């Protein structure tokens, strides 16, 4: 798009023999009433637009950060018109729901803890090349719009997919290239000093991976996957630098937002002193249900003991007890090398699988991992 108010920047990713991919960011023309908005292009073929808005007043009665991420697919993005009786866009498909979750996971922890203003990030798929996945592009679009919005957000965040194809890690692989992959990872992260901090990884092996490996394809061993994470860092850095350029030109100053911490340091100190050594017996209970019941009893006891000192702050005291429990549990695992259920840090829960558990239906299965 062109115009006097349009600003853009781009990142070029070199995949060697697989060619180059160009991600371009653009802002200043669409959704000017939103706190922040941005267009993200992948090779000028696939386009995702993202808009970020925030409420002016906090939701004080919430004990969580009310962030909503939505991805809206448009039929015209693929050159189609809805063919049903109601010529409207339907409910989000599976791919859109998974893309929204992929965005939420790295962006949510980047907001300052204790924020209670409602934030909505809406991504719209405007155009899509049939050979390009749009989900990781949407991560970058959402990060760009949120970074421009003047919110307490420690971005920008870059996202890419890395696929192991013919022994090489390829960024932003096409669908046709993924048919030759033995492993792929969606990775998101941000630049921290001279390094890139990985914030989210979603990895999987394609259904045909065994066929490719048996035909001589590279096996995704632990060391090979680690190489893939390292290969993603220059890509994420390039994406973050392109976003940072636009933030410097068009970003709003961070507004004054109130924060509501789960508990105060004074409350945590008081809770820790009140608990004393009473957490150790709780850590020794192997059965999860019994352990939870014992922790609830301990929490109620501590809250009652401190009620006079901290009136009408039962919820914050309970959160402080939970924080003290997590800290003690982590210390116990690191020092003793044993988790609460008796497993070592490298042991997994018992896994069982059974097929044909229901009568009459064509197929049924039961998969269990420990008590889950």
Named regions from a protein language model:
Residues 152-285:
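Mobile "lid/hinge" segments at catalytic clefts and subdomain interfaces of large enzymes
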Residues 34-120, 125-132, 197, 201-214, ...:
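Glycine-rich, flexible beta-strand/loop modules in the N-terminal catalytic cores of phosphate-handling
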Residues 2, 15-19, 76, 80, ...:
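Residue-level signal for well-ordered alpha-helical segments
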Residues 1-55, 59, 156, 255-372:
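Extended amphipathic alpha-helical scaffolds
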Residues 2-14, 18-21, 35, 47, ...:
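Alpha/propeptide regions of enzymes that mature by internal proteolysis
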Residues 30, 49, 103, 113-167, ...:
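Glycine-rich anion/phosphate-binding loop at the beta-strand->alpha-helix junction
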């Amino acid at each position: 798009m062109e115009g006097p108010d349009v600003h853009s920047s781009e990142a070029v990713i070199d995949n060697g023999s697989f060619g180059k991919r160009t991600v371009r960011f653009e802002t200043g023309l669409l959704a000017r009433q939103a706190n922040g908005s941005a267009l993200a292009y992948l090779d000028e073929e696939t386009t995702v637009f993202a808009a970020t808005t925030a409420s002016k007043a906090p939701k004080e009665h919430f004990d969580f950060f009310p962030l909503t991420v939505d991805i809206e697919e448009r039929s015209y993005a693929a050159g189609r018109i809805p063919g049903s009786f109601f010529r409207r866009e339907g409910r989000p498909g599976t791919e859109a729901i998974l893309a929204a979750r992929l965005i939420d996971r790295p962006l949510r922890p980047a907001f300052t803890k204790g924020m209670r203003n409602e934030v909505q990030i809406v991504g719209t798929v405007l155009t899509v090349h049939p050979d390009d996945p749009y989900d990781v592009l949407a991560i970058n679009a959402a990060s760009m719009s949120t970074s421009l919005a003047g919110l307490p957000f420690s971005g920008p965040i870059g996202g890419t997919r890395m696929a192991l194809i013919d022994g090489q890690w390829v960024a932003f692989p096409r669908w046709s290239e993924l048919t030759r992959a033995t492993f792929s990872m969606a990775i998101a992260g941000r630049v921290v000093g001279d390094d890139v901090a990985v914030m989210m990884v979603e990895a999987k092996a394609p259904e045909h991976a065994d066929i490719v490996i048996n035909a001589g394809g590279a096996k995704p061993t632990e060391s090979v996957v680690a190489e893939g994470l390292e290969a993603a860092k220059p890509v994420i850095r390039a994406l973050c630098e392109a976003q940072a350029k636009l933030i410097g030109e068009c970003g709003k100053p961070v507004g004054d937002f109130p924060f509501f911490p789960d508990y105060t340091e004074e409350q945590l100190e008081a809770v820790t002193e009140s608990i004393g050594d009473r957490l150790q017996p709780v850590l020794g209970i192997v059965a999860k249900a019994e352990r939870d019941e014992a922790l609830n009893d301990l929490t109620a006891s501590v809250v009652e003991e401190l009620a006079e000192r901290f009136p009408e702050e039962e919820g914050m005291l309970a959160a402080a007890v939970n924080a003290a429990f997590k800290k003690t549990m982590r210390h116990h695992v690191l020092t003793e090398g044993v988790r609460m259920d008796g497993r070592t840090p490298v042991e997994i829960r018992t896994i069982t699988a059974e097929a044909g558990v229901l009568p009459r239906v064509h197929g049924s299965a039961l998969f269990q991992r420990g008590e889950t």
